[in-house]
């Protein structure tokens, strides 16, 4: 999936010139030394050929990804220059600082380059295949699925190795990167018959040092990073300022790359989908990110939720010599089905592979709608199961009473 950098049509030279003038004006506004040349920004441009391609390149290298893609569609000159890998490498480096690492750059080059990597990972996963009808006919594992059906195609599974996957993770707080990590493979997954394949799938990113990781120290946030000062946890319980700042300011990107099939996708929701404050202790704050992934032909539920958990702990409150400081204590990934059960390692590998080729969108509201739809249907399913269990309980109680009455009736 590539960003379309082909012009929609032969845009008129007048429109091209307007775009160029605007970009040149913005370019010159960055430099205080070139203020004398500001008049260039309003000078008429007679033709595209009258401007240097070096100037175009200098303009485009200052743009972010969406703007660069839009500019590439405006004229043939921009379209040609926008194919330069160095431009997209700069965009990816700004968006995901972890891509600055030499080993990650080599990885991205091996799977198609930075332009393809950005096109795959900037849009977020959207899955709207969750319907009420589907969950009203939710099949039970033992009755509806045979063992062969449940475990699917063994040949396909044997072609998937945990070592094929790479996690590229970046955390931002108020546009400042506070953590960048790269995890090669999936820890503790060696051996086909090992416990990994049958036990609940979970990656604890902070537990394992990434290969040649340059950011292996503690990840902290303090007042100097923009956190509000907290005098005491009792006060925070009442006003919740710190909790609100964390929800509004934290952003997570968790990109999964499969080196064998040369595909990548961002499994995070960028902004938090929810969380819990003061849990499990009053000093802990847990934020939940994630996405809804397809599991068709893998699990009976057809879709699962990828849950990315981030936990911060208050290690200092405001005092005379210390600032309010939080420490990142957990960053993990796990998959859960509609009933809240953890997906095992074997099926998780199949789901992750399928997720790398599913539908994505740059429309963030559509991404949120997909996640909220999943939560809504999941809640309805749980309520329906509770109603069924409640009816069964009443039937069992009435049956027990009836047997008890009949027993004494026969005796007497």
Question: Which positions does each model-derived feature cover?
Answer:
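Skp1-binding F-box subdomain of Cullin-RING ligase substrate receptors
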Residues: 2-5, 9-12, 20-164, 169
